[in-house]
Structures are given as C-alpha cells and as structure tokens.
Amino acid sequence: MRPKLRSYLAWLPVLLLVVPVILWPGYSMAIQELIPRLSLDLTYDDNILFSRRSPQRDWIYEVRPSLSWRYRTERDILDVMAGLHGQKYNTEHDLDTLDQDYRLYASREVFFGTTISLNARYILDTTLDEEFTEEGLLLSRQERHVYSLEPAVQWQATERSTWAFSAPVYHVNYEGDKNQDYSTEYLTLSYSYLLDDEKTSLFAQPSVGFIDFEYGDTKVYEMMFGVGREFTERLFAKLMAGLSYTRSHIDERFEPIGPFSIKVQDEEDYSKTGWVGAGELKWDWDRGQWNMNFVRRVSASGYGETLIRDRLTTEASWRITERIHFKGRLSIGQVKSQSDKTLRSYYYDYDDYVTYDVSPAIVYQLTERIDVQAYYRYSLIDYKEVSDTRHRNRFFIRLDYRDVWFGQ
C-alpha cells in the first residue's frame, strides 16, 4: 500500500470523531431519531462453504442488534449507526463469527446551494457471504476488514444544473494469505441538467481511479453520459453509458506448494479499452414496488487483479393483506478477468464465471414493531472455463424488532 494511503487511513478514526463536531449544527429546530433494531434468525444451509466437491450442512443461529441515531435540521444531517451480527453454528463451531458494522454520514449546507458531506464506514465480516452478496464474487472464507471514506461537495449552480465532486477511498484487508488486500482511490465529477419539461435530466460523469494490489496496480479512466426521466410520479428510469480505459501492471508471483515454490503469475503490462454503464428503473404501485439496477464496471477484487463485472439486480415487494406481504430479489452477474492470460492460483480458478442468486420471502406483521419473516435463498456459480458448478440452498426464519424514538 502506498504511504499516502496509509496516512489517509490512519486519520480515519480521527475523522470519525472530529467531523461530527465540525459539522455540528448551530441552534435551530432539530428532529432526532433513535432507532433500536434486533433480528433473530434460525438458518439451515446445505453448503456452508459453497464447495463443489464436499458440501457441508449445518444449522446456524444468528442475532443482529443495531442502534442508529439520526439528527436533522434545515441545513444539517447527521447519521450514526453501530451494528453487530453474531453467527453460531450448530456443529461447525470453528466458523462462529461476530461481524461488526459502523457507519457515519454527515452533511451541511455551508452556504446557499453548496453542501459538503462525509460518508465513512468500517466493516468486519467474512468474504464468503458478504462479498458474494455485495459484489457477486466467490473468495476463500476469511475475515474481511473494510475501511471506506468518501468526502464530497455538491453545488446547485442554477435551478436546473448541479455539480458534484467526490473522492472515495476504499481499503480491504483479508486475514490470512488466500485473498489479496487492495486499495482504491477515485476522483469523480458529476454534472446534471434538468430540461425544460421538468421531467428529463441529462448527466455527464468523468472519473479517474487508482487501484493498488499486493502484486500490481491499475489506473482507471472513465467517461459516462446518460439520461434520466421521471415518466410519472411513480415511474423513473435512468441510463448511463460510456468508455473506460485501464493501464495495469502485474508483478511476477510465486506461491509455496509444500517444499517448493511455483510461478503462478508472470510479470505483465497491459491496457484495455471497453464500455461501462449503469441503469436503474423504479416503479411504485399502490400495494408494492419494483426496482431494477444494472451495472457494468471495472472493479478491484481480492483475486489481486481488476475484473469486468456485469450485474443485473431486481427487487420487488407486494402487500397481499394488511399484515402479509411478499418480497423477492434476483441477481445475475458475470465476472471476467481483464488480463489476456488466464491467471490461476493454488486457491482459485476464476477467470470467467456467472452467478445467480434468488431469494423470495414472506413477511407477517405480528405487531406494529415486530415482524416474522420466512426466506429461501438459492445461489449458483457456473464457471465457464472449467467444469465447475456450485449450488447452495438456505432457509431462514427471522424475528425482526424495530422501533423509533423521537426527540427534539
């Protein structure tokens, strides 16, 4: 990791303490919310390690307590959240975990039309579940530490045009040596313009990114244009597309296999040009809603190289009765190496694969604050270059409590 980034991350705990004080609102009418939440899960998993050769089954007892505090004034927003996720396996006790999640979001309108903000987060979790859900990537099961920091500024230049600038920093550290740590730094400029019809907006977004791996680095340059339209009060669509250009360097690498060391990676320099894009569709109904998102982007990964990731995600909910509603999620993704060479390691064979993930659920509202939920989740990974297909079925029963306490 570069010294500059090390220094940046070292200041993260300080920023988490100092920024709320700097952005603390002056005297004005404020709305505060304290939100406690507790979820209790009983889960059956028929392939806890997502293995093809020897799937293991187990029952898992899960508890998720969290506490959020929200502060609002006309000029200021301050959100703080702390959450835990404990998992206790019925037989595989060495897989027991206690995940942690801490978040901070603060923003202030410093003068008319200009808002500064900071988004920070620290996560401790495991790769096998969380990284697959978030990124569609299958990595060896290890603890994952994630540090993210995103300062931003937004300027409402006119009634129709808005400029925004952000500089997100992201660092991932994996326990052990099966996955490779990486860091990313991006600079992103966004511009939007609302047309005279008051429903259609045009977008432009250039960005430059720097990715550091343990055995290489990548520079990413992207330019995207797009259009968004609010067809009705309930239907909105947005589509962005553009070009990306990357320059990558990969170091020569060896891995120990018993008493020997074998070369698993040649030194390589290469550049790639391709297209990137993002789209979203939101549709609200009287008794539910439907959202769909698509993204194609150049992405860092725990494999130690950049990937091209395509992912389509759709979510729907439907209220059947006053107390019962259905919700579901479907995600389809493809992961492909940017390198011309098939980079394989002792742990991975990951050059090209497709993932499918579907999770329907029924939710019953016991009381105003308590829900009972029944989930099913099916996951599939299909490797294109080798004969390897992996399946995973999970069943969940969840008791969910959520309350909101108000104050001024």
PLM regions and their residue ranges:
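Intrinsic disorder/low-complexity segments
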Residues: M1-K4, I22-P25
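Bacterial N-terminal signal peptides that target proteins for export
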Residues: R2-P13
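Bacterial N-terminal signal peptides
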Residues: W11-W24
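Gram-negative and organellar
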Residues: M29-Q408
